[in-house]
Curated annotation (Swiss-Prot):
HAMAP family to which the protein is assigned, alphabetical: Asna1_Get3 (MF_03112)
Record-listed E.C. numbers: 3.6.-.-
Protein name: ATPase ASNA1 homolog
Top EC group: hydrolase
Keyword Ribosomal protein tagged: no
Gene Ontology biological-process annotations: tail-anchored membrane protein insertion into ER membrane
Gene Ontology terms: cellular component: GET complex
């Protein structure tokens, strides 16, 4: 490392202070504490932003466990907060599992559109998961949250989430090119069902609206002023390898990433007084922390402790979230 380079602040203070951010993704390998970190970040953002939404896109839906509160597919206020909301979606469920609020309308047209749309998108490989993200994004954008934090599934799912606007743009483009063929068929279909008042262009208009929103989201995802990604890892080989792969893929996708959280670290006061396993783990972690420092010298690297108790419940998360803002100092650490 070059000695005269000033190291970047080892916290997420830079993200919390960046008022322009609209979308923050938190991801990494399974089991590294992504949910605790994303929930803690959302709590800190709620102190300085008007309204914050945290969305879980992991089918395991750990944010319900983290906040000790059941969340659904509709944004729900988190207990103990006035401006923090949470929701959980399953991207594998497809459009049929989304709540009816996503397909509002005064007549049967939109309900027909939902079914027809599901059938049509099933014919396009990879677009079903992307379209469920798209419908959620449409809902979220309409609610005008100041910032949205995504608690993502393990890496493979995360990369698909990041790429979904491009997948949807491509898929909807194909559908819209077919709309002249689809509209007459839809007209015949709804007439057979006795719904003569339904406008055959309803589906086409819905697709047009969706494409417009997704194009906008795609532009925002590629704008570092509006979107960034926080990688969470632990100081072990496989986690570090996965983090490097994730950083490279994000860079390839044009997504900003300049924050890494290293979680579950041992902060030993005196390795001689520690058990042999703790001392051994400490040495392993030190080795990988050195590698992280070399690999990511132009990143904000935040180090979080391994705690004796799990972080669960709003007050516990609120307390733990302070570690994102200033470097963790173990209790009883001797003054230098």
């Amino acid at each position: 490392m070059v000695d005269n380079l000033e190291p970047l602040e080892p916290s997420l203070q830079n993200l919390v202070e960046q008022d322009s951010l609209k979308w923050i993704f938190v991801g990494g390998k399974g089991g590294v504490g992504k949910t605790t970190c994303s929930s803690s970040l959302a709590v800190q953002l709620s102190k300085v932003r008007e309204s914050v939404l945290i969305i879980s896109t992991d089918p395991a839906h750990n944010i319900s466990d983290a906040f000790d509160q059941k969340f659904t597919k509709v944004p729900t206020k988190v207990n103990g907060f006035d401006n923090l909301f949470a929701m959980e979606i399953d991207p594998n469920a497809g459009l049929n599992e989304l709540p009816e609020e996503y397909f509002e309308g005064e007549n049967e047209a939109l309900r027909v559109s939902k079914g027809v749309m599901q059938e049509m998108i099933n014919a396009l490989p990879g677009i079903d998961e992307a379209m469920s993200y798209a419908e959620v994004m449409k809902l979220v954008k309409g609610m005008n949250f100041s910032v949205v934090v995504f608690d993502t599934a393990p890496t493979g799912h995360t990369l698909r989430l990041i790429a979904f606007p491009q997948v949807v743009e491509k898929g909807l483009g194909k559908l819209l090119r077919l709309k002249m063929k689809v509209a007459p068929l839809l007209s015949q279909f709804v007439s057979m069902l006795g719904m003569a008042d339904v406008n055959a262009d309803t589906l086409s208009q819905k697709l047009d609206d969706m494409l417009r929103i997704i194009t906008q989201v795609n532009e925002q995802f590629k704008n570092p002023e509006q979107t960034t990604f926080v990688c969470v890892c632990i100081a072990e080989f496989f986690s570090l390898y996965e983090t490097e792969r994730l950083v490279q893929e994000l860079t390839k996708c044009g997504i900003d990433v300049h924050n890494i959280i290293v979680n579950q670290l041992l902060f030993l006061q005196n390795s001689h007084d520690s058990c042999s396993m703790c001392a051994s783990r400490f040495k392993i972690q030190e080795k990988y922390l050195d590698q992280i420092a070399d690999l990511y010298e132009d990143f904000h690297v935040t180090k979080l402790p391994l705690l004796e108790k799990e972080v669960r419940g709003p007050e516990s998360i609120r307390s733990f979230s302070e570690n994102l803002m200033k470097p963790y100092e173990p209790k009883g650490k001797p003054k230098e």
